[in-house]
Amino acid sequence: MGEAFAERVAVVTGAASGIGAATARLLAERGAAVVIGDVAEGADDVARALRDAGHRALWVRTDVTDEDSVAALMDRAAAEFGSLDVLVANAGIAEPKAPLHELDVAAWRRVIEIDLTGVALCGKHALRHMSAAGSGAIVNVSSILGAVGQANSSSYSAAKAGVANLTRSAAVTYAASGIRVNAVAPGYADTPLVAGLPADVRATMAARQPIGRLARPEEVAEAIAFLASDAASFVVGAILAVDGGYTAV
């Protein structure tokens, strides 16, 4: 796809590693100036590597649960590079697995704040810039667990289902304004979080996906880049499953 994002500015949250880092690299390779919003200092390493490769990139320390922090991220992107054309709302955390009757309310609130409210805040403040420009593309990161049930997954499943319907609502709200909003719903992917799990757990995850393996972060990044690009100009409100067939069963 060459320079599909030439002269465009993309904000990617949660890009210190995994899907976010792969997405930041891919968008930069295709011409975008990339602004990474993350609390983790590893995001600075990603941005530095992109600059060393000749791309435009910077890291802005961002807490997606803090509205002022999110607003500052979007404003910095627009001020530094002249516009804000693409948002990839990827920042998220996992949950402590437990049945609902053993719910840790503090942990529930933390997951909802980061995985759902954080996406909403990023959209809110990206849309300030996109609405003024009359164009833009937002890609939120949901999950297969936003579409299907899994035992002992309360907060994460609720948050990711919320992201999916938040995406649909925003999509129909802003489509006529030249702003497209879509989401990806990844299956189990070979991210650092998963890499730290026992081998038998990783094998079970892979076996649940008809394709028989974990997704590579770069494969999910390709789907995100498609939805953010002009190639998806008529795609609005889609929740694109990138799950190796998990939700097709």
Swiss-Prot record:
<keyword id="KW-0520">NAD</keyword>
<feature type="binding site">
    <location>
        <position position="189"/>
    </location>
    <ligand>
        <name>NAD(+)</name>
    </ligand>
</feature>
<dbReference type="Pfam" id="PF13561">
    <property type="entry name" value="adh_short_C2"/>
</dbReference>
<feature type="binding site">
    <location>
        <position position="63"/>
    </location>
    <ligand>
        <name>NAD(+)</name>
    </ligand>
</feature>
<protein>
    <recommendedName>
        <fullName>Cis-4-hydroxycyclohexanecarboxylate dehydrogenase</fullName>
        <ecNumber>1.1.1.438</ecNumber>
    </recommendedName>
</protein>
<feature type="binding site">
    <location>
        <position position="156"/>
    </location>
    <ligand>
        <name>NAD(+)</name>
    </ligand>
</feature>
<feature type="binding site">
    <location>
        <position position="90"/>
    </location>
    <ligand>
        <name>NAD(+)</name>
    </ligand>
</feature>
<comment type="subunit">
    <text>Homotetramer.</text>
</comment>
<dbReference type="InterPro" id="IPR020904">
    <property type="entry name" value="Sc_DH/Rdtase_CS"/>
</dbReference>
<feature type="binding site">
    <location>
        <position position="160"/>
    </location>
    <ligand>
        <name>NAD(+)</name>
    </ligand>
</feature>
<feature type="active site" description="Proton acceptor">
    <location>
        <position position="156"/>
    </location>
</feature>
<comment type="similarity">
    <text>Belongs to the short-chain dehydrogenases/reductases (SDR) family.</text>
</comment>
<dbReference type="GO" id="GO:0016491">
    <property type="term" value="F:oxidoreductase activity"/>
</dbReference>
<dbReference type="InterPro" id="IPR036291">
    <property type="entry name" value="NAD(P)-bd_dom_sf"/>
</dbReference>
<feature type="binding site">
    <location>
        <position position="38"/>
    </location>
    <ligand>
        <name>NAD(+)</name>
    </ligand>
</feature>
<feature type="binding site">
    <location>
        <position position="191"/>
    </location>
    <ligand>
        <name>NAD(+)</name>
    </ligand>
</feature>
<feature type="binding site">
    <location>
        <position position="64"/>
    </location>
    <ligand>
        <name>NAD(+)</name>
    </ligand>
</feature>
<keyword id="KW-0560">Oxidoreductase</keyword>
<comment type="function">
    <text>Dehydrogenase involved in a cyclohexanecarboxylate (CHCA) degradation pathway. Catalyzes the NAD(+)-dependent dehydrogenation of cis-4-hydroxycyclohexanecarboxylate (cis-4-hydroxyCHCA) to form 4-oxocyclohexanecarboxylate (4-oxoCHCA). Is highly specific for the cis-4-hydroxy derivative and shows only weak activity with trans-4-hydroxyCHCA. Cannot use NADP(+).</text>
</comment>
<dbReference type="InterPro" id="IPR002347">
    <property type="entry name" value="SDR_fam"/>
</dbReference>
